[in-house]
Amino acid sequence: MERSPFLLACILLPLVRGHSLFTCEPITVPRCMKMTYNMTFFPNLMGHYDQGIAAVEMGHFLHLANLECSPNIEMFLCQAFIPTCTEQIHVVLPCRKLCEKIVSDCKKLMDTFGIRWPEELECNRLPHCDDTVPVTSHPHTELSGPQKKSDQVPRDIGFWCPKHLRTSGDQGYRFLGIEQCAPPCPNMYFKSDELDFAKSFIGIVSIFCLCATLFTFLTFLIDVRRFRYPERPIIYYSVCYSIVSLMYFVGFLLGNSTACNKADEKLELGDTVVLGSKNKACSVVFMFLYFFTMAGTVWWVILTITWFLAAGRKWSCEAIEQKAVWFHAVAWGAPGFLTVMLLAMNKVEGDNISGVCFVGLYDLDASRYFVLLPLCLCVFVGLSLLLAGIISLNHVRQVIQHDGRNQEKLKKFMIRIGVFSGLYLVPLVTLLGCYVYELVNRITWEMTWFSDHCHQYRIPCPYQANPKARPELALFMIKYLMTLIVGISAVFWVGSKKTCTEWAGFFKRNRKRDPISESRRVLQESCEFFLKHNSKVKHKKKHGAPGPHRLKVISKSMGTSTGATTNHGTSAMAIADHDYLGQETSTEVHTSPEASVKEGRADRANTPSAKDRDCGESAGPSSKLSGNRNGRESRAGGLKERSNGSEGAPSEGRVSPKSSVPETGLIDCSTSQAASSPEPTSLKGSTSLPVHSASRARKEQGAGSHSDA
């Protein structure tokens, strides 16, 4: 039984946070200085770490001591709050028998004043012992010396978590090395007005970054084929940073509701920062923010890889595109693996400045291995490949130095790559510098905060603290600015005259289409196609291409309405010389034997009637000029003979596969109609393609036949 106080003292030893040795200290509490002992030891039974806090807590029981409800009440309180410490390193605790007597004598007064007996002083927790208290040798002569020494060299017992920062339950919280302790919220370094300014700044920058990255992505959607490999990773890179900027904007809107825990008045807990993955909202924000931050960095590395393959290894776009599956596997797989690992390790931390959740804000090891190390690795690999690619491009530029045009293009491309890489690397390297600076000085900042608030929170103050070692708000603002501005560099790559043209065309296409303008455009495209195709045929014939030439025309419907009334004669102005086109058409007809036979049939079948039929049906009202009966009969006969020879002229501009007569007569027909009649013609008539390959003699013969009729 005699060893029970010593065993209890051994149990209390782990409570000593900053003790390196078990030492006694002189009593400084005035009420207990008249006791038979003058040395004490902390922490005591209630977990008090110094005599000042113990004296304050003991003051709640002074009413009992002043009323002297029990003759031994004052001695018991001093032994409980200021325990005895002997030179033999023996902590003496109050006895159970004395405790039971005090409670029995003072129970009525405690009920009257509403005093609650502390759980730490329950009598059944105290040891059975005698009431004799050992006294240190020379109690009054040795008191002044150690007391002065204590004033000169204060005892550093480490950090004690304030009561309002303690967390309930097993949530895995850890702050300044203390379990179940969380940082305060709002931020422990800055004032409220500084935090408001920082939040507004982050919100504005996130909006700019979000708009820039969305513009890059939407430009890609307008013309997907424009951004092929090796440039395609820029699009995925911009998508990643659009999500990052969106998360910061969400944090700006929500404030600290996601990054901080609300105060609990019942448990006497204040606002604390979220630590761990138990908070679902904070975990979701962390997943998106960390995953896409790392994915964006990896996509930049892949961009440098594709540039190196194209410039240094001379890979084609198709060869690089075949490796796209591996690019996606690395870019999305590695960040996903790190994100899942951090969630499993319970490393999620709330950021009470920006309102988001990230990693490494209070855990220095997590910041070192999950933020700094991946970013430094990506910068090293990407910068190495980028320099290798630029060196290869410079070598190519020296090889083609006599080709002024290509050399100028290559020079502009190199400048473009250099500026884009600089816009990415400079902010990223600055961000790494902020992380390193914060990692080195965070412990000092925390000790300064500890020293500034120890008296306010009634916790022991640190032995040494530099009052000037406080963080600057500008450092954190630069860190958030560099985090977001990295995504804006993608706008530089897509920002060109071609992008403006694509956006202008996109808005123009979305307007309501005019049927007249649309049908004119269709006709103009058809004429341009015929002219281009005939030029190719002439080129082949000039070089002695064997066999007859045939023009196979495929008419394509543009979805326009044939009921609209318009005049398409002016659309033929796109072709400058239709006489040349007619000459080429005549040449093509005579090169084919089958076409010669068909031409003879057409002569016998009254060719002018066929021509009048073609142009007349397409012209609409102008067909009344050939309204006699004989003209109709000859027209019908010509139609019959043409149908027997598989040369029926379709009304919509199509030519039979067996016909070697090209459909180029539309130009002459439409032009002549536009000149002769100002009345608008139907769309059906304007899109028909009559034959314009008859000779001058045939025209004269047709004119004579028409006059006879």
Swiss-Prot record:
GO biological process: cell proliferation in midbrain; embryonic nail plate morphogenesis; establishment of body hair planar orientation; establishment of planar polarity; hair follicle development; inner ear morphogenesis; midbrain development; negative regulation of canonical Wnt signaling pathway
Domain FZ, residue spans: 19-132
Entry's transmembrane regions: 202-222, 234-254, 285-305, 325-345, 371-391, 417-437, 474-494
Sites where a glycan is attached: N38, N256, N352
Keyword annotations from UniProtKB, A to Z: Cell membrane, Cytoplasmic vesicle, Developmental protein, Disulfide bond, Endoplasmic reticulum, G-protein coupled receptor, Glycoprotein, Membrane, Neurogenesis, Phosphoprotein, Receptor, Signal, Transducer, Transmembrane, Transmembrane helix, Ubl conjugation, Wnt signaling pathway
Nucleotidyltransferase among keywords: no
GO molecular function terms noted in the UniProt entry: G protein-coupled receptor activity; ubiquitin protein ligase binding; Wnt receptor activity; Wnt-protein binding
Changes after translation: Ubiquitinated by ZNRF3, leading to its degradation by the proteasome.
Signal sequence extent: 1-18
Motif Lys-Thr-X-X-X-Trp motif, mediates interaction with the PDZ domain of Dvl family members per UniProt: ranges: 498-503
GO cellular component: apical part of cell; apical plasma membrane; apicolateral plasma membrane; cell surface; ciliary basal body; cytoplasmic vesicle membrane; endoplasmic reticulum membrane; plasma membrane
Compositional bias per record (Basic and acidic residues), positions renumbered to this chain: 596-616, 630-644, 697-709
Gene knockout outcome: Half of the males without the gene, but not females, display abnormal claw morphology or absent claws compared to wild-type; at the age of 2 to 3 months, the claws disappear or become rudimentary on the hind limbs. FZD3 and FZD6 double knockout embryos have a curled tail, exhibit defects in neural tube and eyelids closure, in the orientation of hair bundles on inner-ear sensory cells and die at birth.
Disulphide linkage map: C24-C85, C32-C78, C69-C106, C95-C129, C99-C123
Membrane topology category: Multi-pass membrane protein
Residues in the Extracellular compartment per record: 19-201, 255-284, 346-370, 438-473
Pfam families from the UniProt entry: Frizzled, Fz
Polar residues bias locations: 583-594, 620-629, 669-690
Domain notes: Lys-Thr-X-X-X-Trp motif interacts with the PDZ domain of Dvl (Disheveled) family members and is involved in the activation of the Wnt/beta-catenin signaling pathway.
Subunit relationships: Interacts with LMBR1L.
Family stated for the protein in its record: Belongs to the G-protein coupled receptor Fz/Smo family.
Free-text function comment from the UniProt entry: Receptor for Wnt proteins. Most of frizzled receptors are coupled to the beta-catenin canonical signaling pathway, which leads to the activation of disheveled proteins, inhibition of GSK-3 kinase, nuclear accumulation of beta-catenin and activation of Wnt target genes. A second signaling pathway involving PKC and calcium fluxes has been seen for some family members, but it is not yet clear if it represents a distinct pathway or if it can be integrated in the canonical pathway, as PKC seems to be required for Wnt-mediated inactivation of GSK-3 kinase.
Protein name (Swiss-Prot/TrEMBL): Frizzled-6
Organism placement in taxonomy: Eukaryota, Metazoa, Chordata, Craniata, Vertebrata
